[in-house]
A protein has these predicted regions:
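Non-catalytic N-terminal regions of enzymes
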Residues: 2-184
Length: 185
């Protein structure tokens, strides 16, 4: 029995060896430590459309945009002394909303991701753990997701500042710790 556990652990480590990991930035370090069932550290951004959301198209839009946000395709891990973000090969799922907003992230339900995409009737919502991004990053992600969703529905979506393209390579500033750059003495 013990050798089976060791072999399974070894296989998991070998499988994860190719995955990248990212440090939590200074602003995010506090959130994994303070998250409880009473303090979720989750925020929500929503958009209401003119017609009901098509779940299949929303899922396809999510699959198309997640590649542009590699730092969102991560799970929170505990290291020896600190938490870190590890890349995952999993694909996030858009789900129908049926629970209270801004609930604590649940590894089983959310696939380990630190965000979730929800829909209900005409509304698309994205909930993020503060350890992953701030409000600005959340708005940029939602705008990009909405633009792709509308494009897949055959609607000509607006383009311009703040609307990203799936072909765009992420800018290095998107990964950086702004606190360390601008505030650290």
């Amino acid at each position: 029995m013990m050798f089976g556990i060791i072999n399974a652990t070894k296989e998991r480590l070998m499988r994860n060896r190719h995955l990248k990991w990212y440090r939590l930035d200074n602003a995010a370090k506090i959130f994994p430590s303070v998250m409880t069932s009473r303090m979720s550290a989750v925020f929500r951004i929503s958009a209401t459309l003119k017609s009901c959301v098509d779940a299949g198209i929303l899922q396809k839009a999510l699959e198309n945009v997640i590649g542009r946000f590699p730092y969102y395709r991560v799970t929170l891990r505990s290291g020896l002394f600190w938490h870190y973000l590890q890349e995952t090969d999993s694909v996030p799922r858009a789900r129908e909303e049926f629970f209270d907003p801004c609930r604590k992230m649940n590894r089983r339900e959310d696939g380990g991701f630190l965000f979730r995409v929800l829909y209900y009737r005409r509304k698309i919502s994205v909930e993020f753990c503060h350890a992953l991004t701030d409000g600005t990053g959340g708005v940029i992600f939602l705008k990009f997701l909405l633009a792709e969703y509308l494009r897949l529905r055959g609607v000509t979506a607006a383009s311009g500042p703040g609307i990203l393209s799936p072909e765009e390579i992420p800018d290095g500033e998107e990964f950086e710790d702004a606190y360390a750059r601008y505030y650290k003495q």
